[in-house]
Design a protein with these regions (language model features):
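A helix-centric hydrophobic-segment signal that preferentially recognizes long
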Residues: 1-157
Length: 157
């Protein structure tokens, strides 16, 4: 949750720098701001459904930020701005930290799931109302990578 909050705190900085150069991307900025607000409002870390909603909102936000990064490629003057370079480097560092935290979280969730599902700890878990938490899936893992056939590139006939 700390790493996600760092990302959410960084997003306004990236958007404010980018807005100066990308006026016609206003709808993207508005969607990102709305998703950020929704994600920040989901703060009950003990409720599995709230955590699942947070992860869902985060996946949408991550996708929108990816879209923004792609559209930034069309603005070489924006990529040349030093503050944007720093913001993007910081954003990438935060994404790397989120990836590491995701692995740690999923490992802990797996251990909890095993404890909740396996007897005798399952009896204790149900008695004190402990439920398994949702896994934090990487939104990038859902994208299907197309297979590249290298022979097509070398076949000139």
């Amino acid at each position: 949750e700390i790493q996600l909050r760092k990302r959410y705190d960084l997003i306004p900085n990236v958007l404010s720098i980018a807005k100066k150069y990308m006026e016609h991307e206003k709808s993207t900025f508005d969607q990102i701001t709305k998703l950020r607000t929704e994600a920040l409002s989901n703060s009950d870390a003990e409720d599995p459904s709230a955590v699942a909603k947070l992860f869902s909102d985060d996946a949408k936000l991550s996708g929108m930020m990816g879209k923004l990064m792609v559209s930034m490629e069309a603005y070489p003057e924006l990529r040349a701005v030093e503050s944007m370079k720093e913001a993007m480097a910081t954003y990438q560092d935060v994404e790397d930290n989120i990836s590491a935290a995701r692995r740690f979280y999923n490992s802990a969730v797996n251990e909890l799931k095993n404890a909740v599902d396996i007897f005798p700890s399952s009896m204790i878990a149900s008695a004190i109302n402990i439920n398994a938490m949702p896994f934090y899936e990487d939104p990038e893992s859902d994208t299907i990578q197309s297979t590249v056939n290298a022979a097509e590139f070398f076949d000139k006939s």
